[in-house]
Amino acid sequence: MKPSILEKLQQLGDRLEEVTHLLGQPEATSDMDNYRKLTREHAELTPVVEVFQNYRLAQSDLADAEEMLSDPEMKDFAAEEIEAAKAKIDELDTELQKLLLPKDADDDKNIFIEIRAGTGGDEAALFAGDLLRMYSRYAERNRWQVEIVSANESELGGYKEVIARIVGLGAYSRLKFESGGHRVQRVPATESQGRIHTSACTVAVMPEADELEDIELNPADLRTDTFRASGAGGQHINKTDSAVRITHLPTGMVVECQDGRSQHANKAQAMKVLAARLNDAQKREVQAKEAAERKSLIGSGDRSERIRTYNYPQGRVTDHRINLTLHKLDFVMDGDLAEITDALIAEHQAELLAAMGD
């Protein structure tokens, strides 16, 4: 293990002792905000320090075993102990490096997921609907809630564009690598000749800002328009100008919300989406620089990148970033995404570990 990492681990051990002492003081709960902060820090530090203690114990076992090598009667036993200790050290070394990987502060947040139909017209819109169902079913498997924030439906079904909010612990950590181009190859329902068509959708996954204060929104930078909602909403919603369109003038970003029951509700939701988009734009700029340094294809934030192909005739799903192909398309489209998301997270961790070793 690198000396710099050992030094960092020693510092974390010292800090855990300090935090434990502070939490044990009689006045610790007088400032509840600080108390919660210390409790959270204690919970984060404890597993790292415990593994480091086991690492040092394994090193001590190795040293003891090496001393026994000089005793002819203990030589065979010592060799076995050395082999076991070295294997344990390697295992704990890898575990420690993973624990030291920089945490994404957004991982536990709720998300907004935007799905836009691209090339392929009506077929792309139908596929956008299929993707929404896929993510909704995945959310159900994780006991997350799904809310439709805004939807622009196409004439034959599906969506030209749809924004959903997914509420649940870890939603961003599991779905953040879904951003990018999704391509589908299949025979459309409207195709009489049985020819396979290729269509595409773009998916954007954005963490929900904790509060609007997370990002400064100058009222002078915003233009708010109201208009009559259309689509599913009933007679009530069509009689009033309840739909809201907010334009962020410096960037040209436009957010529309019309699925709420009032103008106030739609404006509040639109502001949340806008804050998430602006935060996301800043985050992607940083990610792009970091990914370029790592020569990474995962987590680059590049929305134009084609990340996955869904081939219906072959029942195949291929994620191009990690060359993963699964022949279980029906299961994936029904929300069985765990194998894909786990593989993407593992590859991302491997890239970060490699960067730490440079």
Curated annotation (Swiss-Prot):
GO MF: translation release factor activity, codon specific
Posttranslational mods: Methylated by PrmC. Methylation increases the termination efficiency of RF1.
Subcellular location: Cytoplasm
SUPFAM superfamilies found in the cross-reference section: Release factor
UniProt keyword Cytoplasm, yes or no: yes
Keywords annotated in UniProt: Cytoplasm, Methylation, Protein biosynthesis
Pfam family, one: PCRF
InterPro entries noted in UniProt: PCRF, Pep_chain_release_fac_I, Pep_chain_release_fac_I_sf, Prokaryotic/Mito_RF, RF-1
Residues with N5-methylglutamine modification: Q235
SMART domains membership: PCRF
Top-rank lineage group of the source organism: Bacteria
GO cellular component entries: cytoplasm
PANTHER family assigned: LD18447P
NCBIfam families linked to this entry: prfA, PRK00591.1
Function as written in the Swiss-Prot or TrEMBL entry: Peptide chain release factor 1 directs the termination of translation in response to the peptide chain termination codons UAG and UAA.
Family from the record: Belongs to the prokaryotic/mitochondrial release factor family.
Protein's name in the database: Peptide chain release factor 1
Protein species of origin: Neisseria gonorrhoeae (strain ATCC 700825 / FA 1090)
